[in-house]
Amino acid sequence: MNKIAWAERSCKTNTIGTVNILEILKLIKHKTIAVFITSDKVYKNLEIKRGYKENDILGDYDPYSASKASADLAIQSYYKSCLNKNKNVKIATARAGNVIGGGDWSPNRIIPDCVTKWSQ
């Protein structure tokens, strides 16, 4: 996959996909909890020797990180502008590192490691 196609796919999956889910949550009439698992890639890589903090700068120089940060910002803005008014919907985000990606079954990823352990 060339870089432009990869960038477009990242944006569609991470940003637009998240917005699609948020739009559905606006319509929910029953009690629902949505947990968005994002990534540490939402943060700008400053090459610091500590873990990221919630108030660190979002976004970086590659399309993948930008799409992750955009999704995270969409979640925040939807919550502040409309979802906080719907008492049936609760949302949360969790920024985890090394969860999984499309076709990513590398070792030391949360989802593949869980699947491996559960299947034993």
Q: How would you name each of these model-derived features?
A:
Residues 1-3:
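Serine-hydrolase catalytic-loop signature spanning alpha/beta hydrolases and amidase-signature enzymes
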Residues 83, 111-120:
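Alpha-helical substrate-binding/gating segment
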Residues 28-29, 118:
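A generic alpha-to-beta junction signature in SAM-dependent methyltransferases
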Residues 39:
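Residue(s) in the substrate-gating loop at a strand-loop-helix junction
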Residues 5-23, 30-33, 42-99, 105-106:
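Catalytic helix-loop patch of NAD(P)-dependent Rossmann-fold dehydrogenases
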